[in-house]
From Swiss-Prot:
Residue ranges annotated for the ATP-cone domain, each copy included: 49-139
Statement: the UniProt record of this protein carries the keyword ATP-binding: yes
Record keywords: ATP-binding, DNA-binding, Metal-binding, Nucleotide-binding, Repressor, Transcription, Transcription regulation, Zinc, Zinc-finger
Spans annotated as Disordered: 1-23
Cofactor(s) it depends on: Zn(2+)
GO BP term, pick one: negative regulation of DNA-templated transcription
Annotated protein name in UniProt: Transcriptional repressor NrdR 1
PANTHER family the record matches: TRANSCRIPTIONAL REPRESSOR NRDR (PTHR30455:SF2)
A Gene Ontology molecular function term of the record: zinc ion binding
Amino acid sequence: MRCPFCGHDDTQVKDSRPTDDNASIRRRRACPACASRFTTSERVQIRDLVVIKKDGSRSTFDRDKVVKSLQIALRKRPVDEEQIERIVNGIHRRLESLGENEVPSKLIGELVMDVLIGMDQVAYLRYASVYRNFREAKDFGDFLGKMGRQGDD
């Protein structure tokens, strides 16, 4: 693998270990040219998923986009990065298990919301406010009312 610091073509793997959920391998690498060290992550990719957006356009599934949206929703909440990685790995596996090459963005949003509602209601509300495009305080109130009614069932 090419060194991200100096561009040298051949780096050495110093340490490899699976992540806690065994969904990927973390490798610690060293560059013999500049002596820099860096970490890489290796995952199995069954197929390239294409996301169909609301406007009909298509783009390659961007796992980091899901990670960032969860980090924003879970900011200052008692959830660490490893838990976020496990959530995203689970969502990605569910999408791949559908057997489809194309998935609607709405499905990804719903999967994220399904995880968040059982995990952290504040994060669920934060995510929903962006995902459902809340424009005013009334939208929050309406949504909280629906959450309360669902909890009563």
